[in-house]
A protein has these predicted regions:
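Conserved ABC ATPase signature
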Residues: 172-176, 180
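Helix-to-loop junction immediately C-terminal to a conserved catalytic motif
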Residues: 86
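Conserved ABC ATPase "signature" region
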Residues: 101-102, 149-167
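Short coil-to-helix segment of the ABC ATPase nucleotide-binding domain corresponding to the Q-loop/switch region
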Residues: 131-139
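ABC ATPase NBD coupling module
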Residues: 103-119, 143, 149, 263-267
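Conserved catalytic motifs of ABC-family nucleotide-binding domains
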Residues: 193
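Catalytic Walker B motif of ABC-type/P-loop ATPase nucleotide-binding domains
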Residues: 197-200
Length: 285
């Protein structure tokens, strides 16, 4: 997305993501080796916490406009990958690139500029408790500037409509269900006009019906607005609906990187063992 102010008229309301015309699962798209313009690149990234290696020599890339789902058991570094991409953690070795810029050596002010293009939807939503839902979604718009207040109101209303939360605009986050808070957090993330959206376990602690609806929201928004997505999840049904490509982490390493269909059909014993686990019983990472 460019740096112009968000045009309220360009945000179209979707159909019900749970309805019969909900978007189909993403088509299989093989990663393109040497893609000249990947949005995100990890090159030989390693990180340890104390004496415990978390990620070792992990490499992958995400093409512009595609969705990568990061899968793996508890404690393999899925969420750590997102935090490094946001600049909250620095790798011990290797490099991370966003739109061709290496971010691993950036100062905090430089990282703040990157975070205007890359935003993260946290597990807990990270909403401001003292602000209403509308005020939370409006916050990045007001920080960014460039819109009249009437335009801010219009954009907020349309974003809340996009995620099905238009009826809770005046509520405080604490009064909302987990699923509603996640939906509002997605709306707030989008108000920052990101090029890349990171989702950290969006279906944790929600029932399958809400998980399906969140998946429909995420997929439809990506389709309409064209941003790149990275989704950390333990929910295979959720991943099947969203993923263009899959990164499977095992024992701190990139055990598989490729199209979802290839992952699901793999006869690799480690992948089969993961697929045969009850995904809804996996602990949070």
């Amino acid at each position: 997305m460019d740096d112009e102010a968000l045009n309220p008229e360009e945000i179209a309301l979707p159909q019900d993501p749970s309805g019969p015309e909900a978007a189909e699962p993403a088509a299989e798209v093989a990663p393109v080796p040497g893609d000249p313009e990947p949005t995100i690149v990890f090159r030989n990234v390693s990180i340890s916490f104390g004496d415990r290696p978390v990620l070792e020599d992990v490499s992958f890339s995400v093409e512009r406009g595609k969705t990568l789902c990061i899968l793996g058991r508890s404690g393999v570094g899925k969420s750590v990958s997102l935090r490094m991409l946001m600049g909250f953690l620095k790798p011990d070795s290797g490099s991370i690139h966003v739109d061709g810029q290496e971010i691993t050596g950036m100062s905090e002010p430089e990282l703040q500029a990157v975070r205007k293009r890359v935003t993260m939807v946290f597990q807990n939503g990270a909403l401001f408790d003292s602000l209403t839902v509308k005020e939370n979604v409006a916050f990045p718009l007001r920080e960014r500037g460039g819109l009249e207040e009437s335009q801010v109101v219009q954009v907020v209303d349309r974003l809340l409509g996009l995620v099905g939360a238009e009826d809770v605009g005046d509520a405080l986050p604490a009064s909302l269900s987990t699923g509603r808070r996640r939906a509002v957090a997605i709306a707030r993330a989008l108000s920052a006009q990101p090029e890349v959206v990171l989702y950290d376990e969006p279906t944790t602690m929600v029932d399958p019906i809400i998980a399906k609806r969140l998946g429909g929201i995420i997929q439809r928004l990506k389709s309409q607005l064209g941003f790149t997505s990275i989704v950390v999840t333990h929910d295979m049904r959720f991943a099947e609906r969203l993923a263009d490509v899959v990164l499977f982490l095992d024992n701190g390493r990139a055990h598989f990187f490729g199209p979802l269909k290839q992952f699901m059909a793999s006869e690799d014993p480690d992948i089969q063992q993961f697929l045969n686990l009850d995904a809804y019983e996996l602990p949070n990472v």
